[in-house]
């Protein structure tokens, strides 16, 4: 048994990885800021100790896992080096972990977490699968056959991984503090393609993914008949979305997903493709798909009188558009109210006009102050720059949360990657209910 200490344990990936090592029988603890982060709930439920940052947390005999947001000058990292302990970056450590399994990486600018969550749930319907999801959820199942994990392209960290399979959901320009342009992003994915050992499953409508070169087969999925794996005869029902799946032009089977929106059908197709290639029992896969309950912070719903409150991680214009589309398809007779907190000044600056366009698809828009990050907490623009671009939009804060009372028979989307949950929590307290995120 190894004693692991995670520096930045409340990070989504770090939280998941800490849970996996705990499940596999190791002693696990970690440190982070004292401010509430939704990932700490799962850690506490497993009895994993969360400490405030302090050099005294580091003891002889530990293996220290260093979160990617924390520099080598961090007091705990300095202490670990002074004690000559093994200090391993998150992505490097995860790369070692996955080598013990048949691994499936899920990567792409958007849809990674939702697809990884679906993949782990569906695969466990047929084969024992450990998993690491970017919503802070992780599970290490002893004697697992498979390992499903989220692989982020930021700073090319995913190049530390050599998975058996890779699902690539899309390529888009994001993380403008690191990537220069879309071609820079595409080059990172091209490099990742050469790391894959068995096959790549890629979205067929993405021009950049269509240009990939790889040493393994690439199977394209989507809603078009020229895709290797495609959905047809799509029907929206009160139980979700039903569709037929074709593989290489031949009918495979009919599936039902409890989710709505084209992007969720595409996620399901990617997962079905993996199960098909690994010759899993299709009936087990169908049953598991029908029982998928979603992942944390991805269209998580709470009902309050005639309102549906939705907690969603959407923080890029395309993700916002997809979340609004899902709300409209699931609740066609309700108004859509967007409450959005931009995440990082560089992303807000880079996509200012795109944010305005995507948010304008909602019936009403409220905006929060820009949320900075550990790496970047100031910028030249303000939230007023975005408000000025969206007709009828307004600033919302905890002290004026009651403006949402006026929207009867509405879906209120609380979107963002920062601490937007505090506004939903404030609104729920205002209307007399409480909910732990």
Swiss-Prot record:
It comes from the Bacteria. GO terms for cellular component: cytoplasm. It is found in: Cytoplasm. Pathway: Cell wall biogenesis; peptidoglycan biosynthesis. GO terms for molecular function: ATP binding; UDP-N-acetylmuramate-L-alanine ligase activity. It is an enzyme of class 6 (ligase). Keywords: ATP-binding, Cell cycle, Cell division, Cell shape, Cell wall biogenesis/degradation, Cytoplasm, Ligase, Nucleotide-binding, Peptidoglycan synthesis. GO terms for biological process: cell division; cell wall organization; peptidoglycan biosynthetic process; regulation of cell shape. The keyword Cell cycle applies. It catalyses: UDP-N-acetyl-alpha-D-muramate + L-alanine + ATP = UDP-N-acetyl-alpha-D-muramoyl-L-alanine + ADP + phosphate + H(+). ATP binds at residues 108-114. Its main location: cytoplasm. Its EC number is 6.3.2.8. InterPro entries: Mur-like_cat_sf, Mur_ligase_C, Mur_ligase_C_dom_sf, Mur_ligase_cen, Mur_ligase_N, MurCDEF_pg_biosynth, UDP-N-AcMur_Ala_ligase_MurC. Belongs to the MurCDEF family. Cell wall formation. This is UDP-N-acetylmuramate--L-alanine ligase. It comes from Staphylococcus haemolyticus (strain JCSC1435). The gene is murC.
